[in-house]
């Protein structure tokens, strides 16, 4: 047996011994009465204590004689004979407990407290003071074990480094890593701020079906399920777009939804099959209005959640206080591949040859517009580091967007990029029912030619358009990618609490 194998075997033995020891302690607790009490109440969290009392010195705290109660997980313990120091962690952070034998009821210190384990959840009551080093602490007069932890914290809780464990057992990650906890706190704040931003501008939050008979609103491969009572195959939605625009037809002129979409695609640092999107639709607006709204949204979120319009992501700093760059798709191709002959982008054969020369495999179902878009993706997208709007997307890759009045081969559409990745997609909506029917048919033809991501024909949506959709603009923003930016996270798994993972064998 190698040294590594020997060490691993010894660690397994130690773990099993500790597990058995903790279960024996729980068995003893059961014999004594209620093993999992639920009658302890706290009056402060750790962050509330720090915010309210950190500025006071020890003399002032002693004169005030402030009694508080807290509860949380015991993360560290230093036993020094008749007294100990404990670090207690709760939702707000950490607070130090000073536990002295003579300050507790008889027997509590030696017979109970010293037998507890790291990871146990405890309640404490006592008076506030500051140590000689100035650390706010609680001099405990009452200690109670509220939940016995049967499993030891990993690595004595010096940190959880195994990425697979972090994602599979997110509860351990949240216990172990301050950054992970803060990431999801920021996520929650951003979602709340988005809702406040939208409602303040007259938008109504709605909910639309997660299971659909016809998946629409995006080009993607859907998940399929079966409704037993209806004996009907259904699809987890890939986007809420068509239902939201039905609501605009019905008279709700400004609507938005923040919810999950599902796409049966690969997993990467940028992609999770289950992800969160915000989509919004506003009547009597065009894509220029959406560009202004998007800039304002990101600027507001940065200022309100982070306290600054400057956001650091890796080695880059994004200043959302400045106007964002705007380029057409063709301008971006020329900027990042200067040798491109722009005339090649107007001819199918020339564009196909150009695409193949830079490593793109051109599918039979692709037209000129799709090829130009793929060229843009290959040569320009990774360079769009600072906030940038790309406009003038080909109609072929924009089946739901309004055609441009001057050039019907392109649409009044933009995509929004930061850090070399797409964050949002918006456009003036196609509200010509006959044009929409033709584009749906083109998508059906593409699907028949082998494009698995082409859209289905949605007859009811065409019917809705026939009743009249007012001039409307719509925007979708990937919330997970947005959170990655605001938390300086470099994989989408770091911002989704429970990301998709291959089952362990």
UniProtKB/Swiss-Prot annotation:
It comes from the Bacteria. It holds the Pfam family tRNA-synt_2. It is found in: Cytoplasm. The modification N6-acetyllysine is found at residues 114, 156. SUPFAM superfamilies: Class II aaRS and biotin synthetases, Nucleic acid-binding proteins. Mg(2+) 1 binds at residues 415, 422. One of its GO terms (biological process) is lysyl-tRNA aminoacylation. Its main location: cytoplasm. GO terms for molecular function: ATP binding; lysine-tRNA ligase activity; magnesium ion binding; tRNA binding. Its EC number is 6.1.1.6. Binds 3 Mg(2+) ions per subunit. It is an enzyme of class 6 (ligase). Keywords: Acetylation, Aminoacyl-tRNA synthetase, ATP-binding, Cytoplasm, Ligase, Magnesium, Metal-binding, Nucleotide-binding, Protein biosynthesis. Homodimer. Belongs to the class-II aminoacyl-tRNA synthetase family. This is Lysine--tRNA ligase, heat inducible. It comes from Escherichia coli O6:H1 (strain CFT073 / ATCC 700928 / UPEC).
